[in-house]
Structure formats: C-alpha cells, structure tokens
Regions:
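Anion-binding alpha/beta catalytic cores of soluble intermediary-metabolism enzymes, centered on
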Residues: 1-330
Length: 330
C-alpha cells in the first residue's frame, strides 16, 4: 500500500489542494488534518467551532494557535451562497429555502460538500463519526452521481506485494446483475487511475456454474450482460476467490484469461464483501486503503467508523489526488 500512497502523495505535494476535514473537532480527524499539513500534502480546512478546535489541539499536544484554517457556519457570506446553491438544487424536490439554510447551518457534511461544489475547496474527507449510509444520503443532496455510474465502495487490499480492488464493500446491499456490471466498469476506471491493467473476476461461492444455486444467479446474469457491452478489459466468472487469485488453477481452466490473474474482485453482495475485507485486515495481515467512494460527482471520501488517523489521512490524499486526475465536469 505504501508504494501506491507514496506515488499519490508525491503528486499532490506539487498541487497543494485545499481539502476539507468535515468533523474538525473529532480527535482522529484533527490528527489526520495536522499530519496532512505537516507532511506538506496540501492545505487542510477544518469545519468546527474555533474554541472547541483549539481545545482539541491542546488535547493532542499542540499549541492552540497551531496554524490551520477553521471554518464554521458563522461565515455569513458563505452561508448565504451555500444555501442558494442547495436551494437551486433541491427546490423541485420540495425543499424550502429555510430548510436548506437549516441544513447548511447545522450539518457539517452539507457545509463541506457545498464548499467543494462551489469551488471554495478542492476535496473533502468526512466520517469516522457517523453511520456510512446516513452520510451518503446527506452527500447525495448536494452532489449528483457521475453520469451513468452508481455510487459504491471500493476497497484496495495490499498483501504480499499484490494489490487487489474489491467492490462493492459499502453501499449496495444486494446488487442486481445490472448494478454488478456498472460496479465492474467503474472499478476498472479507478484501477486504471492507479496505474493497473484491469482484470475483473465476478466472485461467488461457485466456479463456472458448480454448484448452481439461487445465490449465484445474478452473478451469472451479470456475465451475460457484460457480453452485450463493448468493454476494453478482460473479465470472467462466476468464480471462487482462490480460483480468481491463485495462478496454479490456470491449467484447470485454460479457457479463462482471468483465472489466477484477477486484480478486481466484484463481490456478489455487500455482506460477503464487507466480511472479506475485514477478515483480510484482521487475520490476513492485508493493508487496506479505503473504502473509496466511487461514482460520486465530486472528490469526497467517507472514513468508516473506527478509522485511525492514518486511514483518514490516506483518504484525504486520495480525495486530493482524485480532484486532480478526474475530470468531474464531464
């Protein structure tokens, strides 16, 4: 994971992006923001009450006047600008202007995503404090998904010198065949941004139809659907993870370009994805980067509950990197 992050960090040091850390009073978010600044990765902006942030800076052993930018909804001009932005977006879905003002004033995720949407910051990292689904709901009020993409979570696993991308680890409970296809196509876009040649395996507890169960039907349908798309990458499935990753299975399945070579694993459902990455982290000693929020129309990342400062820092770096390498306007 270090090589990937080193490459990203080298890149963002040059561009010095402005990154919002939404829960500026949270100890772990604050530590990550301070590390972001001290490592010269970019310019952190904290959302929080100034006196509370200063208190927290003292609590983590820094001078309360440590030079870091703090913003809050006391900034009247911004507040009016963000309320207007939100109201324009939501007036047709029954939101009143005063409700938009209330959201902008009281919700840091809303304020932070408005900062990015209005160009007052380049990227944002949020979370570590709230439930993931609630945060996504708030984000999607301000930010649309990318045209033709769905929003999902992608986690990078780095183990024994190999990097594997796992999707969807965070958002869609039971993806349909069509959603699995969208997740696969978006995952290859991301893998290429990180410099990988995508090789996609659709995972299951069965390999090429044995044993066939009701649980594997949508995965097989996804493969059939993939054949109707004009894609420029190799994919195959359904298959078990060992078949996807272990080269010694190549001779058993000589007809497949993916067996033993996969670097993108499309999971059949959220529970299997989530269990897999947590097991790998805890028991398999894999390094995790992410989950990255894919398909959102702005460079915003959500840190899961119990994220360490270094995990939050990685997400901040990736958000800054995304704001540089992804064209969000198109």
């Amino acid at each position: 994971s270090m090589n990937i992050m080193q490459g990203i960090n080298a890149q963002i040091k040059k561009s010095q992006k402005r990154v919002v850390f939404a829960e500026g009073e949270d100890t772990n978010i604050l530590k990550a923001a301070v590390a972001f600044k001290n490592s010269k990765l970019g310019i952190p902006i904290l959302i929080g009450k100034e006196e509370r942030v200063k208190e927290q800076l003292k609590n983590i052993g820094l001078d309360e006047n440590f030079n870091i930018e703090i913003v809050s909804s006391k900034n009247i001009r911004e507040r009016e600008k963000y309320t207007k932005h939100l109201y324009q977006k939501l007036q047709r879905s029954g939101m009143l202007e005063r409700e938009c003002d209330h959201l902008v004033r009281n919700d840091r995720v809303t304020w932070g995503s408005c900062m990015v949407a209005c160009g007052d910051a380049d990227a944002m990292v949020t979370g570590g404090t709230r439930h993931h689904a609630a945060t996504i709901e708030k984000l999607s009020r301000v930010v649309d998904s990318r045209p033709g993409e769905i929003i999902f979570g992608l986690t990078m696993l780095v183990s024994k010198g190999r990097t594997v991308f796992v999707s969807d680890t965070n958002v869609n409970d039971n993806p349909t065949a069509a959603q699995l296809v969208q997740i696969a196509i978006s995952s290859t876009r991301v893998a290429r941004l990180f410099g990988f040649d995508p090789k996609v395996a659709f995972l299951s507890h069965s390999t090429f139809g044995k044993p066939a169960t009701v649980r594997t039907k949508h995965v097989r349908e996804a493969i059939e659907l993939m054949k109707t798309k004009k894609v420029d990458f190799d994919y195959d499935g359904e298959m078990q993870p060992d078949v996807a990753l272990n080269p010694e299975y190549k001779e058993s399945y000589p007809f497949s370009k993916i067996v033993g070579n996969a670097n993108i694993l499309i999971m059949p459902a959220l529970h299997s994805a989530s269990i897999t990455v947590k097991l790998m982290k805890t028991f398999g000693g894999a390094k995790l980067i992410g989950p990255l929020l894919i398909g959102l129309g702005l460079p915003i990342e959500i840190a899961p509950l119990r994220s360490s400062p270094s995990e939050i820092l990685n997400l901040a770096s990736i958000a800054a990197y995304s704001s540089e390498v992804i064209d969000y306007k198109n």
